[in-house]
């Protein structure tokens, strides 16, 4: 059952995320008739606009970032009329009355989206409270990063929960809005084919890769203070681990799903001072070639020395009955050869081959779930090659390919934020992250960082356009595992 609000407040509405993702997502929902006709979207930032001026600004953002086949003049005009604007200094609580004047009755519900730096959260919450916009009918969405470690994350969450209850807080991880990520739950729990094998008896190992070809790309200040472990592993990749490893929830209600995810985070085997050398690899890209062009190294781009990692590979374990003994190899990095996010589940080989050795080597079955750039699900199978085979069957590994883009080519491809924005407006918290999840994630991440510090581990330089340091290959190879590149 939905609980739709009548007003949305969008902080940071002139920022890059708003222009590229948030405003286009809201437009897409409205163009498809998924937003109420009387929904008011109150936008705010420090930029000096009136409502008409901001509507002009928003129109330019839509023209630039919405796919041309989704743009429609009538739909655009209808959406722009939903937008209202007030210039507000988020650090001055007395200015929030301007937002209250634009919002109308709060009892009809308000969805508040803080697309701002975490350092501004407390000021925003104080202003919302003072203006009467933080009552029981409000819900609050927070963009990452939610802290730099457990202590700072707790500080943010404590400040938020002094005013809002946990059920009012919607912590965003945009990976959870991706269609293929959501499809992982359907794949696992909607098909009898996989569940009997989805455990340590049937699965040899799991690989999760999130690879980027870009370097800093304008994120110098944030990224150098964060690094790949905190930027990507703590949030996106650990959420993917949870969706692969979680037990079936009783139903698809928000807390039922999140209860099972947090059990996975708490079951992650700690990586400490004694195991960081054997279970983690860190790297930092040097100069090289990316996209056919010569590119500078990280330190040259940054303009100063830095020990921040731009690549990390980890051998992780989930210590419970289902997954005992199954390694999860995870890696992420910048300036890698391809932009790709994927999960590869490798099943155990057949216990005995009945086929002639001259027919080829049996390969273990694999399930490959590609999240980006294309949304694809593939399964590898061994088949017999056509022929008379007088000396025994000749076998080959082939991939059964389910391209969601092709299968559902008559459906619009939505960006992840469309789903998340709609769920926020309608009050469905399933794809948002609960506080205990965040805390359990940070406990594991902090242990790794403490191990790096205690052992004075520094990132190893790798050439841009390669798959990270050679030690990352060795991390898997010494277990007889090859990264799926």
Curated annotation (Swiss-Prot):
Reaction catalyzed: D-glucose 6-phosphate + NADP(+) = 6-phospho-D-glucono-1,5-lactone + NADPH + H(+)
Keyword hit for NADP: yes
Top-level taxon in the UniProt lineage: Bacteria
SUPFAM superfamilies the record matches: Glyceraldehyde-3-phosphate dehydrogenase-like, C-terminal domain, NAD(P)-binding Rossmann-fold domains
MF terms in GO: glucose-6-phosphate dehydrogenase activity; NADP binding
Enzyme class: oxidoreductase
Keyword match Ribosomal protein: no
Keywords: Carbohydrate metabolism, Glucose metabolism, NADP, Oxidoreductase
PROSITE patterns: G6P_DEHYDROGENASE
Residues the record lists as binding substrate: 174, 178, 212, 231, 334
GO cellular component assignments: cytosol
GO BP annotation list: glucose metabolic process; pentose-phosphate shunt, oxidative branch
Annotated binding of NADP(+), by residue: 46, 89-90, 144
Catalytic residues of the enzyme: 236
EC number: 1.1.1.49
Pathway recorded for this protein: Carbohydrate degradation; pentose phosphate pathway; D-ribulose 5-phosphate from D-glucose 6-phosphate (oxidative stage): step 1/3
Role description: Catalyzes the oxidation of glucose 6-phosphate to 6-phosphogluconolactone.
HAMAP family named among the record's database cross-references: G6PD
Family: Belongs to the glucose-6-phosphate dehydrogenase family.
Name of the protein: Glucose-6-phosphate 1-dehydrogenase
């Amino acid at each position: 059952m939905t609980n739709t609000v009548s007003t949305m407040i969008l902080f940071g509405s002139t920022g890059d995320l708003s222009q590229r993702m948030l405003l286009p997502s809201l437009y897409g929902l409205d163009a498809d008739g998924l937003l109420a006709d009387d929904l008011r979207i109150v936008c705010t930032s420090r930029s000096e606009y009136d409502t008409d001026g901001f509507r002009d600004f928003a129109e330019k953002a839509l023209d630039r970032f919405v796919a041309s086949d989704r743009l429609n003049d009538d739909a655009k005009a209808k959406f722009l009329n939903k937008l209202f604007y007030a210039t507000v200094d988020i650090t001055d609580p007395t200015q929030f009355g301007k937002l209250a004047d634009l919002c109308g009755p709060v009892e009809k519900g308000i969805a508040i989206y803080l697309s701002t730096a975490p350092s501004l959260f407390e000021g925003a919450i104080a202003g919302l409270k003072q203006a009467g916009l933080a009552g029981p009918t409000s819900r609050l969405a927070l963009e990452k990063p939610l802290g730099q470690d457990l202590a700072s994350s707790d500080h943010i969450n404590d400040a938020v929960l002094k005013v809002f209850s946990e059920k009012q807080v919607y912590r965003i991880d945009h990976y959870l809005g991706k269609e293929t990520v959501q499809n992982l739950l359907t794949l696992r729990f909607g098909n009898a084919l996989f569940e009997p094998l989805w455990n340590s008896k049937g699965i040899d190992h799991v690989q999760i890769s999130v690879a980027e070809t870009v370097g800093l790309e304008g994120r110098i200040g944030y990224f150098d203070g964060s690094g790949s472990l905190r930027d990507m592993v703590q949030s996106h990749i650990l959420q993917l681990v949870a969706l692969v490893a979680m037990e079936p929830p009783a139903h698809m209600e928000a807390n039922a799903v999140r209860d099972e995810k947090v059990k996975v985070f708490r079951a992650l085997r700690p990586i400490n001072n004694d195991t960081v050398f054997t279970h983690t690899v860190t790297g930092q890209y040097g100069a090289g070639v990316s996209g056919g062009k010569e590119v500078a190294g990280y330190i040259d781009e940054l303009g100063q020395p830095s020990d921040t990692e731009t690549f990390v590979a980890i051998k992780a374990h989930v210590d419970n009955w289902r997954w005992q003994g199954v390694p999860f190899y995870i890696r992420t990095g910048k300036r890698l050869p391809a932009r790709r996010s994927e999960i590869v589940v490798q099943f155990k080989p057949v216990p005995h081959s009945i086929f002639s050795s001259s027919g080829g080597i049996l390969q273990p079955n694999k399930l490959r779930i590609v999240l980006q750039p294309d949304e694809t699900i593939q399964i590898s199978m061994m088949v017999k090659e056509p022929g008379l085979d007088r000396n025994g069957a000749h076998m080959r590994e082939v991939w059964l390919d389910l391209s969601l883009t092709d299968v559902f080519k008559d459906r619009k491809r939505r960006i992840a934020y469309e789903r998340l924005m709609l769920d926020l407006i309608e009050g469905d918290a399933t794809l948002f992250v609960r506080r205990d999840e965040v805390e359990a994630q940070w406990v594991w991440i902090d242990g790794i960082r403490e191990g790096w510090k205690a052992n004075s581990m520094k990132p190893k330089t790798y050439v841009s356009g390669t798959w990270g340091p050679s030690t990352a290959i060795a991390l898997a190879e010494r277990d007889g595992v090859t990264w799926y590149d």
